[in-house]
Amino acid sequence: MAGTTSAIDPVFIIISRFWGKRMIVFGKKELFEINPLLTWFFRCMGGVCVRGTREELAVIDNTIAACKEGDTLLIFPEGTREREGKILPPKSGMFVVAAQAGVDVVPCRIFYDTPNGRAKLFCRVRVVYGEPMPAAQFAMQDKRDVKAMRAGKKALTEAWEQLGEPYAFAPKDA
């Protein structure tokens, strides 16, 4: 589970941790329309275009089954790229997938060595992973277990915050 600032973020995560492994990469429709090369890369790495509609329940069910069999899922649970350097709250869907698949969640953050912290050509990049969060932490009574989802969101946000300042690049002048 990663916070995202750029459409290129999945590339760095895949290269830094999962190179050579097949994985499922959830991405919004817009991610697959940015650049033909990125689209090709995401598709080769197991990219799945998710529009957030109810018609995609089969995709979610297939993903849960694949995770139960040991596949890795890369998802950016905020559902959008953040623009101001702030951590956005994760959306609930990720917690439903994690709970039903019974898989641990590994928090992740990406930092760019630029004045505004956004990706730029040839800038330094730091990908930081937190400790795995046990699947039991995301267990739910049902898909609408609001109390469990709130607790999961809080725990993931806190994990992202812990991966912040000690690992971020020192601020630069614009």
Model-derived features: positions:
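Non-catalytic C-terminal accessory region of glycerolipid acyltransferases
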Residues: A58-A174
